[in-house]
Amino acid sequence: GNVQHKFLVMHFTAGSSAQESVEWLASPKAKASAHVVIGRDGSITQLVPFDRVAWHAGASSWEGYEGLNQYSLGIELDNAGKLTRQGDRWLAWFGTEYDNSDVIEAVHKFETQPAGWEVYTPEKIDSALKVAGLLIDEYGLGEVIGHEDIAPHRKCDPGPAFPMSSFRARLMGRAEDQATVYETTTDLNIRSGP
């Protein structure tokens, strides 16, 4: 069916590479899809036309809307997501080890214990900003949200390593980026005394 464009939903793939995620999401076995996958290097792959429903949100709700697939576009960011500490190493669920410099330790907003989270590369964030900005402009999307926001306690993406606040501000506040112009006057009539 056709999407009723209202929201942009940000995800992480929880996979080992963008190519693997693209291949998986393009497979009927996946029973899931997304409009776009963005790689660690900033590469962009479109999987589903932007006017068609993609199966990225699952059981979800937001601001009175149920089943967000019908109302949103989905961007998947190539990212391992939540990592597990084993000694001095960080491991993804699929076995890949991540260097400490590629991981932040943080508590997810719906959890109480810290975990490791793969950081998002600047290239990935830049590409996501470009794609998201174009989609917001073209389809009039009113809000950028995380999968974790529309499916709390079921999903944890894009997670605490994703700079959602600044990402949203850069996208949704673009019209307000122009500096405010203040005019001052020198025609003040200031008196002292009675």
Predicted regions and their residues:
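Active-site-adjacent loop/helix surface patches within enzyme catalytic domains
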Residues: 1-142
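Short, surface-exposed, charged/polar-biased interaction segments
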Residues: 31, 65-68, 149, 156, ...
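Histidine-centered divalent-metal-coordination microenvironment in nucleic-acid enzymes
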Residues: 72-76, 151, 159-161
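Short, small-residue-rich loop/turn micro-motifs
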Residues: 77-79, 148, 186-188
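Acidic/histidine-rich, metal-coordinating catalytic segments
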Residues: 138-154
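Short, low-complexity, polybasic intrinsically disordered segments
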Residues: 153-177
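SH3-family beta-barrel domains
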Residues: 173-189
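SH3/SH3-like (including bacterial SH3b) beta-barrel domains
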Residues: 192-194
